[in-house]
Amino acid sequence: MAAITAALVKELRERTGEGMMDCKKALEKAGGDIEKAIDDMRASGAIKAAKKAGNVAAEGAIAVKTDGKSAVLLEVNSQTDFLALQDDFKNFVAESLEEAFAQKLTDAAPLIASREAAREALVAKCGENVNIRRLVRVEGDVVGAYLHGNKIGAVVVLKGGDVELAKNIAMHVAASNPEFLDSSEISAEAIEREKGVFLQLNADKIAGKPENIVENMINGRITKFKAEASLKEQAFVMNPEVKVGELAKKAGAEIVSFTYFKVGEGIEKPVDDFAAEVAAQVAAAKQ
């Protein structure tokens, strides 16, 4: 019997829209076989149809709340962008955010558990899979947040400065999605990967050139990579003449951390093949 892991329960929950305990029980009964668990749930009437991998909840909304000293950034997923625009979904997100902020939650797990009944009611009403995916809570001397169209959210923690500065830098983070806070955080492995990519892409240009010229070309690319990847080295979106790190320093502030969320980031979305779907339905009808 396969181990009933939290990841397995989560996958079954995402594919069926059922509660965590129901999914765990179904997996235990099926000996850890997720496909058998789905078939058993269908047979028992617990679900109308198996929601296979195609029913991935990869749309949804990002929500954020801050009081200037702390902030919560939350992602809630739906299967379609249409549902994400509906009041029922928006209310679920807003209530979830308020609870997470009031209880100072630092992880999504307790919020998922406490909001399960409300989630199940929403799923039953809308017929779509809905999931609380992740949340982050930050605290600091000064905290600012920015939300772009409910699809991208960012929070920034400063030491010194003010909320307006933190909000402006959060806006920059939302627009630029930096990978690192500053260039010192960039690992040697990341630099080597970038070097390898550069050499592959520029093989024709490099061929036959002296070693010192090639080295200068590589160093130029790495310098540019560090500037593009690190927040402090990026040109500030509201004033490209100034780097973000310089902006903070001039205001007597230090950037402590940043967090960036984008809806569906990292979730593999299925590619719909309408022709194949119709063909499958026709074939099934002939049987």
Swiss-Prot record:
Residues 80-83 are annotated as: Involved in Mg(2+) ion dislocation from EF-Tu. GO terms for cellular component: cytoplasm. Belongs to the EF-Ts family. InterPro entries: EF-Ts_dimer_sf, Transl_elong_EFTs/EF1B, Transl_elong_EFTs/EF1B_dimer, Transl_elong_Ts_CS, UBA-like_sf. Associates with the EF-Tu.GDP complex and induces the exchange of GDP to GTP. It remains bound to the aminoacyl-tRNA.EF-Tu.GTP complex up to the GTP hydrolysis stage on the ribosome. It comes from Pseudomonas putida (strain GB-1). This is Elongation factor Ts. It is found in: Cytoplasm.
